[in-house]
Amino acid sequence: MKKQDLIDMEGVVTESLPNAMFRVCLDNGCQVLTHISGRIRRNYIRILPGDRVRVESSPYDLTKGRITYRLRAKSSTD
């Protein structure tokens, strides 16, 4: 599948599941079952419940996706 065919969305991790799977609540209210991308796995980036993430999903199955980026938390000084 080509990169431009994927749908990018943002949401919050609500649940951590076995085998690096996560349940993410998107900004539009939908629940998505996601796994982490290879780059996140290779760089040992920790994803915990409550983190904001960017998810890409196929237009054919919007209930599954892949976490491609963990967004930075806003600092308390901002």
Swiss-Prot record:
Keyword terms: Initiation factor, Plastid, Protein biosynthesis, RNA-binding, rRNA-binding
InterPro entries per UniProt: NA-bd_OB-fold, RNA-binding_domain_S1_IF1, TIF_IF1
Molecular function GO terms recorded: ribosome binding; rRNA binding; translation initiation factor activity
Gene designation per UniProt: infA
Biological role: One of the essential components for the initiation of protein synthesis. Stabilizes the binding of IF-2 and IF-3 on the 30S subunit to which N-formylmethionyl-tRNA(fMet) subsequently binds. Helps modulate mRNA selection, yielding the 30S pre-initiation complex (PIC). Upon addition of the 50S ribosomal subunit IF-1, IF-2 and IF-3 are released leaving the mature 70S translation initiation complex.
HAMAP family, per the entry: IF_1
Name this polypeptide is given: Translation initiation factor IF-1, plastid
PROSITE patterns, per database record: S1_IF1_TYPE (PS50832)
Keyword field contains Metal-binding: no
GO cellular component: cytosol; plastid
NCBIfam families in the cross-refs: infA (TIGR00008)
Quaternary assembly: Component of the 30S ribosomal translation pre-initiation complex which assembles on the 30S ribosome in the order IF-2 and IF-3, IF-1 and N-formylmethionyl-tRNA(fMet); mRNA recruitment can occur at any time during PIC assembly.
